[in-house]
Regions:
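Histidine-centered, transition-metal-coordinating active-site segments
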Residues: 3, 7-227
């Protein structure tokens, strides 16, 4: 259900794309694919939108114990080397059951759920809200907002065709639904579009843009002040 994420996860949602969440983009993509596949995704879309009679299926997609969380905790634990996120997801899945159309856990699986909650909290402390992660995200948001501001003033900026589309056009919720170019360009974006732009922007005459871009490349990032 995260196919609507852009480069660097949530960064684009409030910078070069306004007023549309990655969940909404995911749904637009699914509905488009559903048309191309002659309705074969209709059931999946119903579950995604929580419109399917068996409501517990939506909890597997989006809930406090959904498959997304079980997936990203293990994956991020592996790639960051932070072992606390390496939980026993197979055990949790095995302990799942359904009662009154809701997901429940067998009593002998409570310990596994406690481990899951602890793992998620520790991963937020050590990875997702780590000062370096937060600083990089804030700098990238500031960089893209500055690039968007310059683009709105007609300043020429290097960008891939897909990134240029979003920098030089005001894209909102309605545009994504009614302008097919939005979706076409969005699915072409990946992390490489951003990194390549940052390298070129690091020598741009605009000091704000070049300083932010160079800081990202050289890891000269903002400091986090805790008060």
């Amino acid at each position: 259900h995260d196919i609507g994420h852009g480069p660097f996860s949530h960064v684009l949602e409030d910078t070069i794309v306004k007023g549309v969440s990655h969940e909404e983009i995911s749904l637009i993509l699914m509905e488009r694919m559903n048309k191309e596949m002659n309705g074969q995704l209709s059931l999946a879309i119903q579950i995604f939108k929580d419109e399917y009679p068996k409501r517990f299926l939506h909890q597997l997609v989006s809930g406090q114990l959904d498959m997304d969380r079980l997936d990203y905790l293990r994956r991020d634990s592996f790639y960051t080397g932070v072992t606390e996120g390496n939980l026993g997801s197979a055990r949790i899945i095995k302990m799942l059951d359904v009662a009154d159309d809701r997901l429940v856990i067998e009593s002998k699986g409570i310990y596994s759920i406690e481990n899951f909650l602890t793992a998620r909290r520790l991963m937020y402390w050590q990875v997702y809200l780590h000062k370096t992660s937060v600083a990089y995200e804030r700098m990238l948001i500031s960089t893209l907002l500055r690039a968007k501001e310059l683009a709105s003033k007609g300043v020429e900026l290097f960008a891939s065709p897909a990134l240029r589309f979003f920098l030089y056009n005001d894209i909102n919720h309605q545009e994504f639904y009614h302008n097919p170019d939005c979706l076409e360009n969005f699915i072409q974006l990946d992390d490489n579009d951003i990194w390549t732009a940052l390298k070129v922007w690091s020598t741009h005459p605009d000091k704000v843009l070049s300083t932010l871009s160079l800081g990202m490349i050289n890891r000269n990032i903002f400091k986090v002040e805790i008060s």
